[in-house]
Design a protein with these regions (language model features):
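Surface-exposed loops/turns
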Residues: 36, 69, 82-83, 136
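Acidic, glycine-anchored loop motifs typical of Ca2+
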Residues: 93-101
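Sec/Tat signal peptide C-region and signal peptidase I cleavage site
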Residues: 16-23
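A short, amphipathic beta-strand motif
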Residues: 27-33, 43
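A short, solvent-exposed beta-strand micro-motif common in secreted/extracellular proteins
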Residues: 84-94
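Short, flexible loop/turn segments at beta-strand junctions in immunoglobulin-like
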Residues: 33, 76-81
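Extracellular beta-sheet/turn segments enriched in Thr/Pro/Gly and aliphatic residues
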Residues: 111-147
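Beta-strand signatures of extracellular beta-sandwich domains
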Residues: 42-46, 87-89
């Protein structure tokens, strides 16, 4: 009898938060500066810097697409862990190729953006500059950059 009740007693002693699933939220992304109304906005939420900012390589990232049909595009990204340090990167896939088109030296042909409007003088934005703590129903403004 004790062997049957022991696992239940241990489970009951755990804090409730350890038993329940992690809370998630929806990020409300507002993208500004779109100069065309064709294609798709492709966004990724990263929880680690490993593959940031590449949506194409982003394994384990939360991804979302929205029609690029106005100069300002608003859309939601559900399933983001509350309290997690995350960063958002996106690009306007103007030709709907599902990949970011680049010039021969690697400079993006399509507009790009990142949370906190993170930029670098040379190269892709860094995770640490784009990082923020996800809060419930948070709005994330991102201005597109053209190169």
């Amino acid at each position: 009898m004790i062997k049957k009740l022991l696992p239940l007693a241990i489970l009951a002693a755990l804090p409730f938060s350890a038993v329940q699933a992690a809370e998630t939220t929806t990020l409300h992304v507002v993208v500004t500066g779109l100069k065309t109304t064709t294609g798709t906005i492709r966004a990724c939420v990263f929880t680690t810097p490993a593959e940031f900012p590449s949506c194409e390589k982003g394994v384990g990232t939360i991804k979302a697409d929205a029609p690029a049909n106005a100069p300002t595009v608003k859309f939601d990204i559900p399933g983001v862990p509350v309290g997690a340090s995350v960063a958002v990167s996106l690009f306007a896939d103007v030709d709907n190729s599902q990949t970011m088109e680049r010039h021969f030296i690697g400079i993006p042909k399509e507009p790009i953006g990142a949370s906190n409007n993170a930029t670098e003088p040379m190269g892709a934005p860094k995770f640490e500059k784009a990082r923020f703590v996800a809060k419930p129903n948070m709005t994330v403004p991102i201005a597109l950059r053209y190169y």
